[in-house]
UniProtKB/Swiss-Prot annotation:
Residues annotated to bind heme b b566: 98, 197
Gene Ontology CC annotation, any one: mitochondrial inner membrane
UniProt key word Transmembrane helix: yes
Other facts noted in the record for this chain: Heme 1 (or BL or b562) is low-potential and absorbs at about 562 nm, and heme 2 (or BH or b566) is high-potential and absorbs at about 566 nm.
Gene3D superfamilies, per database record: Cytochrome Bc1 Complex, Chain C
Record's protein name: Cytochrome b
Binding positions for heme b b562 per the UniProt entry: 84, 183
Domain of life from the UniProt record: Eukaryota
Cofactor: heme b
Location(s), subcellular: Mitochondrion inner membrane
Organism expressing this protein natively: Sphyrna tiburo vespertina (Pacific bonnethead shark)
Spans traversing the lipid bilayer: 34-54, 78-99, 114-134, 179-199, 227-247, 289-309, 321-341, 348-368
Gene from which the chain derives: mt-cyb
Length: 381
């Protein structure tokens, strides 16, 4: 009887088609685990964030103290806060690995799914940015000041736009209050878009490592991949709890233990590690507007990837030339992340500029050209 309810009940039927009887390619590897891991990350972040919001006060005179209160006086508040802060880092690790898998195996050819994914990345970055401002430490305040100030680069409307976002003439109480509102609201928008992301994915079915049609060889999602995902859940929770319990401040900035002071500028203003690659690209261009446009394009360039696909094969698995350039792109992104955390001086300036040019060249010119060359080599045989 339970089987029939699962397949006939209007609500359970949707869940059944998405999680139980979903036809999945039999050869999808460990790299396909990250979608479900991102779902788990989102649930963890929403739940821990909800408990933090119960004790947090969005006021410049009390924000820092309320975070201290959470860590000292609230039952397991220190744990909730550490899981939330490090959960964000793990979220971005999973996102970047998920995107890398999509680029390597050609999953971007599901254009609707891919483009919604890019919008999700942008929303995730916005959520993380406004969330980083909430503890109201030195790096929170100055990070908010520097990054929001970039909008002043836009001609004519720039200054008005910045003051509109600030809610005044500087980052102050109005800014903190609205950033808290955005930080509370955006995860639910991410949740809604995730459902649409899955909806489009289930219209086409999952890609597979070979990048070929797998309709002839599908197996049900449960029990095969549900248990495989469960293993991933346990591994990720192990890493998250290890990080939160033993090294909670490893990925944070020491400056944020100092309450925000508008009169004292930190020696080196930098965002969290997951934004450093984009921050390095921003800093590598001497022009302010050019830097802002490059920063935005460093993320939205992912939307051009399906249009720049010139290969006759979908996956990179049998394309050694493109594989080399893919791993060069990965190495280049790691170099950009490192450069973003360094002071603005030689040789870091030059390395950052070379890495930024390489980043865009690999996406726009080198990888499409490598694919075209591979097509020519294949046609010779």
């Amino acid at each position: 009887m339970a089987i029939f309810i699962r397949k006939t009940h209007p609500l359970l039927k949707i869940m059944n088609h998405a999680l139980v009887d979903l036809p999945a390619p039999s050869n999808i590897s460990l790299w396909w685990n990250f979608g479900s891991l991102l779902g788990l990350c989102l649930i963890i972040q929403i739940l821990t964030g909800l408990f933090l919001a119960m004790h947090y006060t969005a006021d410049v005179s009390m924000a820092f103290s309320s975070v201290v209160h959470i860590c000292r006086d609230v039952n397991y508040g220190w744990l909730i806060r550490n899981i939330h802060a490090n959960g964000a880092s793990l979220f971005f690790i999973c996102v970047y690995l998920h995107i890398a898998r999509g680029l390597y195996y050609g999953s971007y050819l599901y254009k609707e799914t891919w483009n919604i994914g890019v919008i999700l990345l942008f929303l995730l970055m916005a959520t993380a940015f406004v969330g980083y401002v909430l503890p109201w430490g030195q790096m929170s305040f100055w990070g908010a000041t520097v990054i929001t100030n970039l909008l002043s680069a836009f001609p004519y409307i720039g200054n008005t736009l910045v003051q509109w976002i600030w809610g005044g003439f500087s980052v102050d109480n109005a800014t903190l209050t609205r950033f808290f509102a955005f930080h509370f609201l955006l995860p639910f928008l991410i949740l809604a878009l995730t459902i649409i992301h899955l909806l489009f994915l289930h219209e086409t079915g999952s890609n597979n490592p070979l990048g070929i049609n797998s309709d002839a060889d599908k197996i049900s999602f449960h029990p095969y991949f549900s248990y495989k995902d469960l293993l991933g859940f346990f591994v990720m929770i192990f890493f998250l709890t290890t990080l939160a319990l033993f090294m909670p401040n490893l990925l944070g900035d020491a400056e944020n233990f100092i309450p925000a002071n508008p009169l004292v500028t930190p020696p080196h203003i930098k965002p969290e590690w997951y934004f450093l690659f984009a921050y390095a690209i921003l800093r590598s261009i001497p022009n302010k507007l050019g830097g802002v446009l490059a920063l935005l394009f460093s993320i939205f360039i992912l939307m051009l990837v399906p249009l720049l696909h010139t290969s006759k094969q979908r996956s990179n698995i049998f394309r050694p030339l493109t594989q080399i350039f893919f791993w060069l792109l990965v190495a280049n992104s790691i170099i950009l992340t490192w450069i973003g955390g360094q002071p603005v001086e030689q040789p870091f300036i030059t390395v950052g500029q070379v890495a930024s040019i390489s980043y865009f060249s690999l996406f726009l010119i080198i990888m499409p050209f490598a694919s075209w060359c591979e097509n020519k080599i294949l046609s010779l045989n």
